[in-house]
Amino acid sequence: MSIDFNNSDYDFLHLHGAWARERHIERTPLLIGTQSVESRRGSSSHNQNPFIALLSKDANEEHGDVYGFNLVYSGNFLAQAEVDQYKTTRVSLGINPFDFSWLLKPNESFQTPEVVMVYSSNGLGEMSRTYHKLYRKRYKPSIKPRRTNRWTCR
C-alpha cells in the first residue's frame, strides 16, 4: 500500500519494544530521505510493530492531525515514509521484499495483507480509540458460548 501527502511537515511515529516492555513510542521529525521500520525475523512482534503514524508537529493525545497505518500481517514487513526533493511524502507498508519471492502462474492470484488507515483531527487518543473500535468490530473473532456438563467433570 502506498499513499502520497502534499507536504512533509510531520513527525514520524512507530512502536518498538522487548519482552515486558512492549509498545514504546518513538517519535522523530520526518526528514528528507526514507525513515523505515521493518522485521526480517519471519514475524512481526513487540520488537517492531507493523504500525507507523504521521503526526502534525503540534499533535498530542488530545489534539492535532494524526494519520495511522497498521499492516494486518504477522510476518516480515516493511513500513516506511519517504520525503522527496519536493518535500512530498509517500507512506508505504507491505510484505518486506527481503527474502521474499512469489511466482504467480497463469490465472493464479496473490492477496496482499490489508493496511488499516485511520485519520484523527483530535490527536493520538482518538486515533487509538478508532483502531480499538475497528478491530473489535471487524477483526475480533466471534466467541460462541460453550456448555459444559460440570456434573460429569469430577
PLM segments and residue spans:
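Hydrophobic faces of well-ordered beta-strands that scaffold small-molecule active sites
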Residues: 112, 149-154
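N-terminal accessory beta-strand-rich subdomains and adjacent acidic, glycine-rich linkers
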Residues: 1-140, 144
